[in-house]
């Protein structure tokens, strides 16, 4: 079998790893498709990438596409290796030893749509991981009146457009630059950027016509060559180090792992350690599979066997016992080291992304270690406790775990980029466990917070329905409709909420002298459950006789049970209207003159 290197003469410089990310339908796959010249997208449902993959684009191909913009003799780096994150997923933090897997990223933004939820999430994660990036402002060809110039550098094709078209595109581009500023990044059109370490370059492109693609490749190669060359220095012949992109069954090979190799060499027959749950897997490489340089790992139906692979490269590793391998986990070649030492190294790297969990909280599942870390970090920021956090689909045991919590608001499962197994969905419905599943981390956080808010609101409403509310009301002059059995009088509610079936009385000194119970309330002849401050209503009061126990002009209070007063004062004050808070405070002041600890 042949050897497979990513370049003819890589020396000690590896290929820079480029992540392509952006909101669904903004053209990530189309852009990569244009770069590699294959028709990947035409074979995919809904024009959305279905699986993660990687594409190696050698320097000579970059030079071909970029034309006069790139002089290959000026570059030492062997080319570019693109990771294609799935179109229906947001960018997750694929990690390498000590940081983000990608050396540089392309953030693809539809110039007409601007920032969308997944764009904003990608920006947050790029900022958190410190990954340098450029913005590909895609779909410039959809500007009304655009005159396409296929595969041309963007400045030339821009100059060829009419004044109106240029003006419309300028407006869209500067709106995008404004959104970048709002996100905390200084950016400008790439040819105006003097220092790419301080400013993000915006490159207008069309994945459809290829316009601007030469500029994009030129900028990527230039940035990598100028700012990252030292980071590309690797020990080519050293033991391989990589990150698992995806774990999947492959006909004829069993469970395999798709890997981005970012350091060293991996050979067929090597002993490797792969991050897994509950502990790392130690296994021997049975086969190394690699498509050609310009092929896409996701779409090649057949792979060629190779003896070895050198960084940086995308490859498929076939080996026994890979069933429990985790996407996003490290893979290490043992080489001449002690296996136990490498297992310890992998465990240490897994520990770096291990998440803090407690005895009480929600259950979290995510597709990769990196995205699990990002999700739990977002939950911690929102002060949402996590009881369990693992990589993998939502399974029945996850639902069972969610049922063990004490609080209803923690009886919840959050899934990021994962499937909910049918049995798990059935169990969740039966056990009243809420499951939220999304491909946007911050959407999950917002969904959960909205769920908790709604639950707390329902609980408070239930409490309010069953609690005696404070109120003060005055019997109106000339509004006695019946003297007793029951007394029916017109009243004005001064403050608070007067409800049916509420005991009421007058204040005598520092005590309340109960007069009776409000049995009914009518507003303009219609029965109502309550009356608020400012309302004038007629009430029927069971117990007193007008003229003897109560009189016109008297001010009556709701007789608050002490337990109810305590709940209102200590737990619900902020939910009461201002006038009702005033009524409660006045009532407590009166009661505490007699007993300072009343309602405490």
From Swiss-Prot:
HAMAP family: IF_2_A. InterPro entries: EFTu-like_2 (IPR004161), EFTU-type (IPR029459), P-loop_NTPase (IPR027417), Small_GTP-bd (IPR005225), T_Tr_GTP-bd_dom (IPR000795), TF_aIF-2_arc (IPR004544), TIF_IF2 (IPR015760), TIF_IF2_dom3 (IPR023115). GO terms for cellular component: cytoplasm. Residues 13-228 form the tr-type G domain. It comes from Halobacterium salinarum (strain ATCC 700922 / JCM 11081 / NRC-1). One of its GO terms (molecular function) is GTPase activity. CDD domains: aeIF5B_II, IF2_aeIF5B_IV, IF2_eIF5B. Residues 84-87 are annotated as: G3. Keywords: GTP-binding, Initiation factor, Nucleotide-binding, Protein biosynthesis. This is Probable translation initiation factor IF-2. GTP binds at residues 22-29, 84-88, 138-141. Residues 140-162 are annotated as: Disordered. Residues 22-29 are annotated as: G1. It comes from the Archaea. Function in general translation initiation by promoting the binding of the formylmethionine-tRNA to ribosomes. Seems to function along with eIF-2. Gene3D superfamilies: P-loop containing nucleotide triphosphate hydrolases (3.40.50.300), Translation factors (2.40.30.10), Translation initiation factor IF- 2, domain 3 (3.40.50.10050). The gene is infB. Residues 138-141 are annotated as: G4. Residues 47-51 are annotated as: G2. It holds the Pfam family GTP_EFTU_D4. Residues 206-208 are annotated as: G5. The keyword Iron does not apply. GO terms for biological process: translational initiation. Belongs to the TRAFAC class translation factor GTPase superfamily. Classic translation factor GTPase family. IF-2 subfamily. The keyword Glycosyltransferase does not apply.
